[in-house]
Amino acid sequence: MKATQIIQGDDKHKLILLEERFARCVDFHKKYNTEKKFETRIYYPVKLAYENYHWQDILKKLLPKGIEIPGGYETVGDIAHMNLSDEQMPYKNVIGKAILDKNTQLRTVVTKIGKIEATYRFYSLECIAGEPKYDTIQVEDKVRIGLDVSTVYWSSKLSTERTRMVTDFIKDGEVLCDMFCGVGPLVMRATAKRPKMRALANDLNP
């Protein structure tokens, strides 16, 4: 639930929702009256429903005691990419549905199965919620990259490193040789930003 709520019929003010333990604290109230210029304090009843809870809070209610709540997932386009443990796998569909329900921009939730053993270094995946489709569009720095997460290796965590290389190292007029390019995110981003450069890209995975 958002901590800031609109006030019907009042465009100049908003409600800031605090936990009751903070709202009852005189020192806290005085401090934020001064720093944030709160005008008044009221009690605001809140009716909590499924849509008000974060997906992890929902799983805390649904999963058996002792089962670890997933810490997060990687987003690739409109696909949530998870790495569930053996103890979490029996509840994979519950976990996937909670994530899908709370993230309307997502279409599919998948989890890795086993280790990387394929020649082309991609994971075996299982769809645990949503559409069983693995093709998606990942956008990095306004560049649209099409990929199938079931047939290629992809890591969104490398986006920061690609940004650093394109910004700090690759210059106009140079030749970029990426011999292990994957689906080519570095080459595509570099040539989009620096049209006067040349690029050579290759990967074992056709």
Where in this protein do the model-derived segments appear?
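SAM-dependent transferase fold signal centered on methyltransferase-like domains
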Residues: 1-206
